[in-house]
């Protein structure tokens, strides 16, 4: 039995690095950008003065749309709604990595991580987040993960 089955994180579809007979195909998903090779781009997105931070279903839809807009393949998502403040923590697991969020509605703040490898462009997710959460300001950081030196 697959170890992820109890968590509901098993896909019936072969991943993009498998052929239909179950034989793994070796493919390098590292990114080459500006002559530098690395695993993927990890964006750290702080949304201040943000709205819509208490609805896990809306946040799930938003992060799924952000992933699809970036060209990612969604495998699974899970969100938790906290009380009494109504904050939400959740993740959309991608074949190319993940998008996660933690919200603090009492501070009008959300912390979003977008980590993607391969041909996905995590920057394409940002307009989706801006439209859904309407932040008054955004702090954005980028980290190239798995940098080959």
Task: Describe each region flagged by the PLM.
Residues 1-149:
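Polybasic/polar functional segments that serve as interface/processing modules
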């Amino acid at each position: 039995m697959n170890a992820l089955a109890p968590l509901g994180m098993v896909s019936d579809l072969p991943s993009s690095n498998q052929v239909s007979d179950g034989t793994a195909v070796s493919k390098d998903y590292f990114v080459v950008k500006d002559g530098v090779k690395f695993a993927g781009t990890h964006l750290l997105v702080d949304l201040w003065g943000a709205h819509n931070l208490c609805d896990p279903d809306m946040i799930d839809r938003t992060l799924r749309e952000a992933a699809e807009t970036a060209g990612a393949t969604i495998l699974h998502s899970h969100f938790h709604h906290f009380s009494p403040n109504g904050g939400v923590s959740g993740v959309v697991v991608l074949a190319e990595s993940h998008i996660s969020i933690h919200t603090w509605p009492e501070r009008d703040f959300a912390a979003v991580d977008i980590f993607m490898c391969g041909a996905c462009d995590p920057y394409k997710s940002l307009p989706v987040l801006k439209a859904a959460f309407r932040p008054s300001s955004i702090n954005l950081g980028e980290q190239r993960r798995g940098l080959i030196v």
